[in-house]
Amino acid sequence: MPKAARTRAQQRRFEWTLLAMALLALVAWLSPPGQLAGPNHLIQDLGLRALARPPHPDIVLVAVDDRSIATIGRWPWRRALHAQLLQTISAQQPQAIGLDILFSEADADYPQDDALLAQAIAASQRVALPVLQRNYAGLAEGQSELPLDMFTQAAAALGHVHVAPDGDGVVRGLYLQEGPADAPWSHLSQALQCIAQPHAQGCKPQALTEPLSAVGNGSPAPWAVRQHELIAYAGGPAHYPTYSYIDVLRGQVPSDA
C-alpha cells in the first residue's frame, strides 16, 4: 500500500476511534444512574482477572471445613478448642491473627472456657476480633455488637466485617471505616495490617478528613461509612494456602506454614 494511502487509513482509524470514544462518553453521560453498572462490573472483573498475581506468602487461611465439623462435631464448638488453636498458631509467631468469630455472649454451658479463650487472646497479643452491626429489638439502630468485654480487653484490635455485594451478588468493594459516626471501626483486614505493621498508613489515630455519610432510611443514623475501596483480588477462592481447622489443632501442618 502506498505511504499516502496508509497515512489516510491510519487517520480514518484514529478519527473513528475518537468518534467511538465520544459516543461512549455521551451514552454514559445520558444514561440513568446505575444503567451502566453491568458493563462497568464486567470491565472491572476482566481487569482483575488480567491482573491476577501470586498470593502473599505471609497470608494463610484456617478453615472451619466439613472435615473439621465431621471430626469435632456440629457448630458451635467449645471455646477451649479455639483457645488451643490460638495457642498452636501463636507458637509460630505470626504477625497477626484474625479470629473471625463473634463471641458476644458468655458460654452458659462451659463458663470456664471463656477465661481460657481470653487468656489465649491476651497471651498472643496479635489477635483481632470482629465487630458487627445489629438492628433488632434490644439494640438501637446501628449499634455495634462487640465481643464480650473480657475478649475485647484481651484483643489487640477490633474491626468491622461488613461487605455490601453489588446488584449481581458479587462483592467488589468495602468501606475501610464503618461504625458509629463519632468513632467508626476499621475493617478487620486493616486492623490486621495495623497489628502487623503499626506504622503503616492509616494505623495511627487520625481525625476524620472526609465526610461520613449516614446510612439507613434517609434520616440521620448513628452508623456511618467512609473510605470505600475496591478489592484487588489476587485470585479465586482457592488462591491462598488454606489448612483445615482440625489439622492445625492437631499440629498436622508444616512448621513453616
What is each of the regions a protein language model found here?
Residues 2-224, 253, 257:
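Non-transmembrane functional regions of envelope-associated proteins
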Residues 113, 229-230:
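Conserved acidic
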